[in-house]
């Protein structure tokens, strides 16, 4: 198998990026589709497209995608409350296990909201249960790399008119991080006009419309236990090749 990574920029500013894991006979087709994706991106036509092709030498991990649940909400306040409740329920388990004060759960969730609303990060922020940021570089955050979804999962998602290409990328990220040591994730899109976000826990990928308003920044936060081996987990979410099916 081969890894293909595309990065496109305009005037030195990142416009789009995507990656795929491919068999040898599909490299050409996938390389074309990645170039097309870069050329016709909503953020504008790039002036530079980098395409990197690498042979994958380590074993690929296949993961079943977490269940997709689309929720209904027509305003940001309700959406934030829904996401808070899902996160609170999950975090309570880990606060209890680690003997932590339940009163601090909402402060932790507020910290995550502040990070996603501030935006402007290429990767994700990582918070432990005390709200400490754990990334080496908090400007960049951590990147989840070497992932793809099976053709069957892509077709299944796109056959549902409510779901989008963004769901495909996001379900791959959420499934990988939840299987590699993180407790939960919250995400809003960095695309100004895309207001569907999600909260992911082991119970599901909860898609929540209006998790931000149009025109606002977006971001990603992963939650992790304080005792987790972050060096090992960060290395795995970046390097272990995963196909989500
Ligand atoms: C979805 O519609 O399921 C994806 C929501 C998150 C999008 C994040 C992004 O692509 O920027």
UniProtKB/Swiss-Prot annotation:
Alphabetical list of Pfam families matching this protein: BioW
Keyword Magnesium: yes
Cofactor(s) required, per the database record: Mg(2+)
GO BP: any one term: biotin biosynthetic process
Keyword check for Ligase: yes
Gene Ontology molecular function: 6-carboxyhexanoate-CoA ligase activity; ATP binding; magnesium ion binding
E.C. number: 6.2.1.14
Oligomeric form and interacting partners: Homodimer.
NCBIfam families documented for this protein: PRK01322.1
Functional description taken from the UniProt entry: Catalyzes the transformation of pimelate into pimeloyl-CoA with concomitant hydrolysis of ATP to AMP.
Entry's family note: Belongs to the BioW family.
Protein's name according to its UniProt entry: 6-carboxyhexanoate--CoA ligase
Species whose genome carries this gene: Methanococcus vannielii (strain ATCC 35089 / DSM 1224 / JCM 13029 / OCM 148 / SB)
Origin organism lineage: Archaea, Methanobacteriati, Methanobacteriota, Methanomada group, Methanococci
Gene: bioW
């Amino acid at each position: 198998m081969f890894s293909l990574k595309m990065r496109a920029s305009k005037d030195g500013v990142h416009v789009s990026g995507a990656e795929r894991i491919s068999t040898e006979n599909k490299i050409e087709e996938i390389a074309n589709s990645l170039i097309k994706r870069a050329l016709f991106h909503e953020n504008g036509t790039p002036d530079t497209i980098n395409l990197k092709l690498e042979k994958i030498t380590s074993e690929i991990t296949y993961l079943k995608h977490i269940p997709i649940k689309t929720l209904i909400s027509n305003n940001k306040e309700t959406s934030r409350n829904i996401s808070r409740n899902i996160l609170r329920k999950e975090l309570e388990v880990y606060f209890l296990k680690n003997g932590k004060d339940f009163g601090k759960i909402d402060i932790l969730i507020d910290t995550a909201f502040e990070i996603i609303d501030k935006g402007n990060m290429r990767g994700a922020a990582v918070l432990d249960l005390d709200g400490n940021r754990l990334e080496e570089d908090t400007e960049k955050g951590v990147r989840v790399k070497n992932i793809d979804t099976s053709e069957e999962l892509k077709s299944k998602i796109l056959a549902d008119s409510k779901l989008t290409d963004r769901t495909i990328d996001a379900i791959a990220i959420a499934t990988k991080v939840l299987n590699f040591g993180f407790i939960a994730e919250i995400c809003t899109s960095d695309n100004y006009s895309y207001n569907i976000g999600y909260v992911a826990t082991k119970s599901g990928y909860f898609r929540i419309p209006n998790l931000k308003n149009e025109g606002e920044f977006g971001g990603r936060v992963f939650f992790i236990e304080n005792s987790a081996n972050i060096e090992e987990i960060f290395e795995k979410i970046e390097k272990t090749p995963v196909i989500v099916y």
